[in-house]
Amino acid sequence: MSNENVADSDVRRKGGLGQRIAYACGNLGQAAFYNAMSTYFVTYVTSCLFVSYSKALAAQMIAVITGLIVVIRIAEIFIDPLLGNLVDNTTTKWGRFRPWQFIGGLVSSVLIVLIFSGMFGLVNVNTTLFIVLFIITFIVLDVFYSLRDISYWGMIPALSSDSHERSTYTALGTFTGSIGYNGITVIVIPIVSYFTWTFTGAKGQGQAGWTSFGFIVALLGLITAWTVAFGTKESTSALRAKAQKNGNPFEAFKALFQNDQLLWVALSYLLYAIANVITTGVMYYLFVFVLDEPAAFSITGIIPLIAGFIMAPLYPILNRWIPRRYLFTGGMVSMIIGYTMLALFSSNLPVVIVALIFFYVPAQFIQMTAILSLTDSIEYGQLKNGRRNEAVTLSVRPMLDKIGGAMSNGAVGAVALAAGMTGHATAADMTASNIATFKTFAFYVPLVLIILSLVVFWFKVKIDEKMHAQIVEELEAKLASGEIVDDEAQAVIKN
């Protein structure tokens, strides 16, 4: 075996059981954190944060806060590649990614408690100061959560350069992510209701309950981030040595825009993410204001939770025989069926439950295909442009999720205000116009986006397992022959 192959075997080898478990744990809290921020924070804002205000003033404040969230998140979209470049240029004895798991997990966990507490009651004391501090806090929170998210998924190519081994790590992260994301949906109302009653003796979802919910999410996020920080170890290879010199942010942006496969995968995933997060973001309103079945809302967490248990481990097994392109396509077709049923039968609970199965079950296949395609585009970009940008490339997915989250926040706020689904409103108050507005935002617009996502992926995304294997082989040959020259890469090969 050549020295080159010895070097590359470090990054190709299968990770130990402990490392796999530690890595998998990370997305449990990270996904729960994301769902709390992208979905339930706006639910908290529209239903509880301004409950002591007059109806007119509360509506104004809801519009202001949800608008600010959308603006902040869209603005920070352009920061994510810079954060990826920061991670790529991090050099510590812990490696490139683990320090940001430690720091990002700590800071974001502290700040999420702050925003779910109404800035510790400041919202009811000084509205202007509350808005100012909220903007600052939300920006800092979003930045440090992004650093955690980018470093988590950016770690995959540091663990293996083999496409199938990467799918194992991706499956583990997606599996626990499904538990965290959907588990929050299952427990949010019971937790908020329980702690509201415990601290105030009142029924419903009050401030004390939402603050307790924020604290639980923060604790889970901190523990799981630190599990990754202390439980994993990055590998080295000639391929990864190219990433040691990542240059300035301008070069990072240039590398992204020159990687055509990255851009097409990103566009397809963006269309999916916007559709998916908008719909999941307004599910609470479907059960409360359309179906008038708030007690059944937990089904929107139970179905995807069970689906995650089955589909995430199944993906790498099926992917050994079925190309991920077809797994992605099958998932999209299932979602189209689900959307159609939801749009036509949104007031029929049994049909809605069946539709939710079609909607939620394929999520793992779609998301894992996108993540793996983005990950494999790292070597594609390295071969095409001569630069390897791991964290910068993989910062694209969190950036796209952030766009989806911003759209979800905006859509939830718009639906709540336009359809009168705020404050003490009930299902009995809803009119046909209210329901039509809801269905347009929740189902019809996302359905169009899902169809467009499938079209882009099928006709523009070319990178697959076979193509990636050929790229890695060609890269290794060029590094060994000196056709691609990099001092640190050659040092790894020689050693």
Spell out what each predicted region is.
Residues 2-495:
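Membrane-embedded alpha-helical bundles of multi-pass transporters/translocases
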